Amino acid sequence: MLIIILLLIASYLLGAIPFGLWIGKIFFKKNLHDYGSGNTGTTNTFRILGVKAGIAVFIFDLLKGTLATLLPLIFHINGVSPLIFGLLAVIGHTLSIFDHFKGGKAVATSAGVVLGFSPFFLLYLLVIFILVLWLFSMISLSSVVAAIFALLGILIFPSFGFILTSYDLLFSIIIFALAIIIIFRHKTNLKRIKNHCESLVPFGLNLSGQKEK
């Protein structure tokens, strides 16, 4: 029991590592909270610190979720689902003890959790994400739509044995929780989308006609 408790705490602390914030401060002498959206996640890192830093933060944030999900396997822990460890990593990412309980928007770390538990389900979500990104040129909208399609996937796929071969109650609960976290963390982005002033990536069709302010 003690090892389980310690690993659960470790999962939160792993997720809480603010790679974007630390990379910005150490290598660029910039505090991401003072630039752009003020967020320390992948998207703001790309915009403020550049492509290399953005890729690094994305990979690190993704691996936080994956590693946390794999901890029970690494330490031969039975009786507790790997998804619980992954969820704690996402909570750590969004409410980091190392960053005054601030954090990112949970997309990359949530993707890491899904990668560690169901890679094909993540592939399905990645296709949705890329398609929406190309059509509308907004990472925020792509993230929210992918979260919604994750909810649809856990409801529909088990009925057809497609990607998810059986209905997994805990997986469904965790996916629901991750989707709600992602959507909630993007509430300001959704307001900007409504006002047609959301930030855009420099490619895609921008079908909604957003104009950055």
Swiss-Prot record:
- Which keywords accompany this UniProt record? Cell membrane, Lipid biosynthesis, Lipid metabolism, Membrane, Phospholipid biosynthesis, Phospholipid metabolism, Transferase, Transmembrane, Transmembrane helix
Write the Enzyme Commission number(s) for this entry.
Answer: 2.3.1.275
A GO BP entry is:
phospholipid biosynthetic process
Can you tell me where the transmembrane regions are?
A: 3-23, 48-68, 71-91, 119-139, 144-164, 165-185
**Catalytic activity from the UniProt record:** an acyl phosphate + sn-glycerol 3-phosphate = a 1-acyl-sn-glycero-3-phosphate + phosphate
GO MF annotation list: acyl-phosphate glycerol-3-phosphate acyltransferase activity
Localization (cell):
Cell membrane
The EC category is transferase
Specify the pathway. Lipid metabolism; phospholipid metabolism
- Known NCBIfam families for this protein? glycerol-3-phosphate 1-O-acyltransferase PlsY
Q: Which family does it belong to?
A: Belongs to the PlsY family.
Q: What does this protein do?
A: Catalyzes the transfer of an acyl group from acyl-phosphate (acyl-PO(4)) to glycerol-3-phosphate (G3P) to form lysophosphatidic acid (LPA). This enzyme utilizes acyl-phosphate as fatty acyl donor, but not acyl-CoA or acyl-ACP.
The name on file for this protein is: Glycerol-3-phosphate acyltransferase
Q: Say which species the protein is native to.
A: Lactococcus lactis subsp. cremoris (strain SK11)
